[in-house]
């Protein structure tokens, strides 16, 4: 009797792990060298998986998250035992809040010596599990591959997030077998369709609305629903605002895309469709909407907690199906409402014009972004790693394609930028990748410029160097009349640090120097920093409470 089943191949567990990654389309793993990971490294080498090493495990994990943000394929980081895992915890917590599909493979002390005091011995799962969708320890070489498959599936299943597996060293070096089964991501089930009565209520509200608005967020991107959202916006003629990775789903120059008119649009809307973004501090915990605004919430899963204000319709499930069901030509063209918002948008932009050409020394952040925006290509990938300097970027740098805006998300973890930028450029080598950093943020991961140089990753960074922790200094002075622990060394030469590491670096202290310096940075073909001295007296005009 014949059989078509291929015989299982015998291999060490490290190669089995790599083979299961490869079967799901994983071709890059971010890491920092660690002996507990040698068998996984060997497996990756045998399977043709690229290893990218960083100078801190935090950056390896942030880079893996950045990879997932750009590609929507789970990013993978391999972190060594003990301090390697604890160093990656901030990135894991951030990815979990961002719903970024991130798989972390951990080294671990040999199981046969647990409790005996091995180097870097600790049980990772109890402290990783609270910031992960899935956390497990391989109990043998035989189940290592199965756990990798389960981790990949957990990372992408809504709500997506972090999956963690650690591999005791003795198991990782032991022999196992692979039967060549399909990759874990080859057949993923579609999400559920929202209840019909909720869809009917939502469609009815949108059809009768006179001043509708859509507020779209990152889960539109994770839900692969960008085309459905654009169709809904255009067919129902609904103005849209976007944050996070939804920026660019509707191009910034589309007549229905708004940003400066945000307060008016959200505050005066009679119906608001909130898609893929929670009512957290970014939406004033629901307070940005008018007291009589009818709210429709659409997301991939129902939140664990109640919304902070009543919702007329909750639509939970596959976002493409949801938004497609809401699309159509029902209702009016809302032309009067759209014209009101367009007028508000134009007036707000007119008020900015003086700042865009401000010749002050040190520079105004708005002048910095006016010069940079003129050099950015339409598909540029923009990475934000800053406080106030990043907020100005959010205001000034427009997005024209989805998946082009990478910020730290609601966890607000500084130091994420170099990892995100590293991954973005590796994933999209032909596109501009621009990292916008504050001088405070540079201190978290400045040595990663060595990583960028070693791997020949030509990211261009603009540092807003105002010598302070601006997001803390200005509010503290307003509250107390003084500030403490809010100053940095003025004029620090971060550009010289980058040059010493092998990159391109320039200092800009006057406005006339900025455009030529940016042009040279883009033309250098090297990882580049333009270190711009900015005015420490300028505070971003916040309207919301971050807490």
Swiss-Prot record:
Sequence intervals crossing the membrane: none
Task of the protein: Catalyzes the conversion of 2 pyruvate molecules into acetolactate in the first common step of the biosynthetic pathway of the branched-amino acids such as leucine, isoleucine, and valine.
Biological process annotations from GO: branched-chain amino acid biosynthetic process; isoleucine biosynthetic process; L-valine biosynthetic process
Residue numbers bearing the N-acetylserine modification: 2
Keyword Flavoprotein: yes
Taxonomic lineage: Bacteria, Bacillati, Actinomycetota, Actinomycetes, Mycobacteriales
Pfam short name (any one): TPP_enzyme_C
Gene Ontology cellular component terms for the protein in this record: acetolactate synthase complex
Keyword vocabulary terms for this entry: Acetylation, Amino-acid biosynthesis, Branched-chain amino acid biosynthesis, FAD, Flavoprotein, Magnesium, Metal-binding, Thiamine pyrophosphate, Transferase
Membership in a protein family: Belongs to the TPP enzyme family.
Cited PANTHER family: 2-HYDROXYACYL-COA LYASE 2, THIAMINE PYROPHOSPHATE ENZYMES
Gene3D superfamilies documented for this protein: 3.40.50.970, TPP-binding domain
Catalyzed reaction equations: 2 pyruvate + H(+) = (2S)-2-acetolactate + CO2
Temperature behavior of the protein's activity: Optimum temperature is between 35 and 40 degrees Celsius.
Protein name: Acetolactate synthase large subunit IlvG
Cofactor binding comment, as recorded: Binds 1 Mg(2+) ion per subunit. Binds 1 thiamine pyrophosphate per subunit.
Binding positions (Mg(2+)): 439, 466
Oligomer and partners: Heterodimer of large catalytic subunit and small regulatory subunit.
Keyword set includes Transferase: yes
Matches recorded under InterPro entries: DHS-like_NAD/FAD-binding_dom, THDP-binding, Thiamin_PyroP_enz_cen_dom, Thiamin_PyroP_enz_TPP-bd_dom, TPP-bd_CS, TPP_enz, TPP_enzyme_TPP-bd
A GO MF term: thiamine pyrophosphate binding
Binding-site list for thiamine diphosphate: 57
Pathway the protein takes part in: Amino-acid biosynthesis; L-isoleucine biosynthesis; L-isoleucine from 2-oxobutanoate: step 1/4; Amino-acid biosynthesis; L-valine biosynthesis; L-valine from pyruvate: step 1/4
Gene: ilvG
